[in-house]
From Swiss-Prot:
Propeptide stretch(es), residue numbers: 16-23
SMART domains per UniProt: Tryp_SPc (SM00020)
UniProt family annotation: Belongs to the peptidase S1 family.
Cofactor comment text: Binds 1 Ca(2+) ion per subunit.
Protein name in UniProt: Serine protease 1
Signal peptide range in chain numbering: 1-15
Gene Ontology terms for molecular function: metal ion binding; serine-type endopeptidase activity
UniProt feature coiled coil, ranges: none
Disulphide bridges, residue numbers: 30-160, 48-64, 132-233, 139-206, 171-185, 196-220
Source organism of the structure: Canis lupus familiaris
SUPFAM superfamilies attached to this UniProt entry: Trypsin-like serine proteases (SSF50494)
Length: 246
């Protein structure tokens, strides 16, 4: 999950966006069909993840925006055709109107599929949250992002990571002045486990509900620098209203 990479150079902290997706570091290979709501956003290559929330709509991160996107559903090994995948072009791509590319606030986006997906054991929707999650809640993060905190290793097979939501105070202390009321941190303060480049836009699912979207962080799996996600619970009304209007 990293739209931002923070580098400490000569005592200065520099933040800049990167055109890469987030990945899973320190996780494990997901079992086949265990994350049926996970989608791959493709523009000739996998560049971000997303979550199917009904047969025709996907939630992803606003920083994953491209003018043309093919949504790939039912994927497990993205390097080969395994049968059962569904490739559907995006008909509409709608970033949150208050998305801020500098602060990465409101980093959420909706994608309307040009035709409804066929729902089955490989492709199914994840529920939107009924309420916001408590600190300590365990969540599942998944994606095809980088699996190394230093260097690169992009897996073909979907990777998973279980990680807890951290308290707001821990989150704000990790990123002073950068955490809005719309954001939450999750992961491990000791480092070693995180999302990373290539996982951006992908799901953070807690107790069967989509509570987060892989968004940003300082590097990947670095000590004291957990992953940051928008709180999907803050956007349920916007999601429902946008779907109804489109």
């Amino acid at each position: 999950m990293k739209t931002f990479i923070f580098l400490a150079l000569l005592g200065a902290t520099v933040a800049f966006p990167i055109d890469d997706d987030d990945k899973i570091v320190g996780g494990y290979t997901c079992s086949r069909n265990s994350v049926p709501y996970q989608v791959s956003l493709n523009s000739g290559y996998h560049f971000c993840g997303g979550s199917l929330i009904n047969s025709q709509w996907v939630v992803s991160a606003a920083h994953c925006y491209k003018s043309r996107i093919q949504v790939r559903l039912g994927e497990y090994n993205i390097a080969v055709s395994e049968g059962g995948e569904q490739f559907i072009n995006a008909a509409k791509i709608i970033r949150h109107p208050r998305y801020n590319a500098n602060t990465i606030d409101n980093d959420i986006m909706l994608i309307k599929l040009s035709s409804p997906a066929t729902l089955n054991s490989r492709v199914s929707a994840i529920a939107l949250p009924k309420s916001c999650p408590a600190a300590g809640t365990q969540c599942l993060i998944s994606g095809w992002g980088n699996t190394q905190s230093i260097g690169q290793n992009y897996p073909d097979v979907l990777q998973c990571l279980k990680a807890p939501i951290l308290s707001d105070s821990v989150c704000r202390n990790a990123y002073p002045g950068q955490i809005s009321s719309n954001m939450m941190c999750l992961g491990y303060m000791e480092g070693g486990k995180d999302s990373c480049q290539g996982d951006s836009g992908g799901p953070v699912v807690c107790n069967g509900e989509l509570q987060g979207v892989v968004s940003w962080g300082a590097g990947c799996a670095q000590k004291g620098k957990p992953g940051v996600s928008p709180k999907v619970c803050k956007y349920v009304s916007w999601i429902q209203q946008t779907i109804a209007a489109n």
